[in-house]
Swiss-Prot record:
Listed GO MF terms: glutaminase activity
Family, as annotated: Belongs to the glutaminase family.
Catalytic activity field: L-glutamine + H2O = L-glutamate + NH4(+)
HAMAP family assigned: Glutaminase
The protein's name in its UniProt record: Glutaminase
EC number: 3.5.1.2
Keywords, ordered alphabetically: Hydrolase
Record-annotated disulphide pairs: none
GO biological process, one term: glutamate biosynthetic process
PANTHER family, per database record: GLUTAMINASE (PTHR12544:SF29)
SUPFAM superfamilies: beta-lactamase/transpeptidase-like
Coiled-coil annotated residue ranges, if any: none
Pfam family, one: Glutaminase
Amino acid sequence: MLEQALLDDLVAKVRPLLGQGKVADYIPALARVSPYKLGIAVTTIDGTTLGAGDWQEAFSIQSISKVFSLTGAMMLYEEREIWSRVGKEPSGHSFNSLVQVELERGIPRNPFINAGALVIADLLQSRLGAPKQRMLEIVRMLSQNHKVCYDKVVADSEYQHSARNAAIAFLMKSFGNFHNDVDKVLRSYFHYCSLSMSCADLSRAMVYLANQGVSLDGNEVVSPTQTRRLNALLATSGLYDGAGEFAYRVGMPGKSGVGGGIIAVIPGDMSVCVWSPALDASGNSLAGTRLLELLAQELGRSIF
């Protein structure tokens, strides 16, 4: 059974790892974050949230936003419309690879690498008059926190360093798999990545993935079938090139971001968010992964 004392104990056990790994520095706004932060929050499907460490401090969620984007697309499109434009397979290349996009004729491997997330952002742009505002509404609804907001400094910083993502988008456009103005989609995409949320916010927002698509306020966000498929994609492709290692050590569907956050799901039971900014070689939170590994061991839970 999950108790406050367990979370406190796990955070204490993992603290000695702080200082190992490296904070993401290719986005200047992220490079300024202390590597000594560590937090965890767990929300059960009945709405109870427990946390320890820096669990209420907001951070840049970065690629964790790709879960919200894909969920938003599933709310707007038939699945065949999505999966005709993006694949469902692990990548095996870096998350911002141009080579793979070229070799596979503009169809990204999955929605959680940059190319795939840009296609999803393009889909949202096609159906929404104000995609940035709609995304904010979705995230605020899911997290039950109407103060969640974009970090303009982070969004602007990413836009100023957007050459590679722009190249990916234009390459996909050359293959006919990008329909809107590249600059407009990039601005929306960087805003999604700049969402500032705490472990508490994210653990609450992701409850629908643990509860057959039903959010904390009782609304069906996506169907039970769509939820299973989302979790399957998270299990195979949610942790960059570290997805196999994460499945082996933690055994939960998950999604990481270079801001140091990781969300993980125990279907039918709970959603978890950990945060520690220093990353391992795969770009995943080093201390955060260990924290989730210990939690899985203590609870005796895995999807496998």
